[in-house]
Amino acid sequence: GFFGTDRLGHLDSARLRETGQNVQVMAVYTPPDRTGDAAYRYAADFVGAYDAVLDSAANRSLDPPWQRILGRADLERACRPGGYGFLLFMEGASPLRGSLGDLDRFFALGVRGLTITHNHDNEAARGCFAEGPDSGLTAFGRELVAALEARGMAIDLAHANGATIRDTLSIARRPLIDSHTGLRAFHRASPPQLRARALGDDEARAIAATGGVVCIDFLPDHLKGPREPGRRVGLDDAVEVIAHAVDVAGVDGVGLGSDW
């Protein structure tokens, strides 16, 4: 578990504190086979699991404990020496069931950011694996972007198709992010889905121009595409992609988005 000492998995409280990391964004991911009410329940249960971690005796015994980040003051407090916080971020709009009322419900539960799609289509937009017409935001998706901005929630374009990215850029009035991505410049020989999952240079540049950030992830296929037998993708490859992103989007427009 999160407070265990077996050091299994990618993340636990002890390792976060050892590295000096104050804030952890916690993804509320919904698989594509969950839609409608099933997607809503799945995401609500996911949020409940994070709440259970924060409310647990193991967390309360820490000095200081992990806290919920619900606004700017919470974030600033968590980023001070000795502060620690969780920020909940929904990955894919399927749990909203096409309803701004559901957005309000998840906002009340502590969700403070939304990745509009996760590869597949939902009520708000088309994902990067979508087939057929190159459409982007739906009518609900456009309402959703405005509603997210009105609530001060982060808008994430990871996993979106090109039309969804263009549509969102055309109406957004606040900074946008891509929380975990590769760059299409390194995928000239990759299969279509991997190319679609990566950002073009123009897209990365446009996201950074909003005052936002493009975060490069560390998945080998996302960095360089399918590997030749026996070839490992390593730190040098990640640095090469990050350096290209900085050339395109500027140093202030690039971050790390491990996707682990």
Predicted regions and their residues:
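N-terminal hydrophobic targeting/anchoring segments and the immediately downstream early-domain regions
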Residues: G1-P133, R184-R188, L194-W260
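Loop-centered beta-sheet repeat module
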Residues: P133-I171, P175-T181
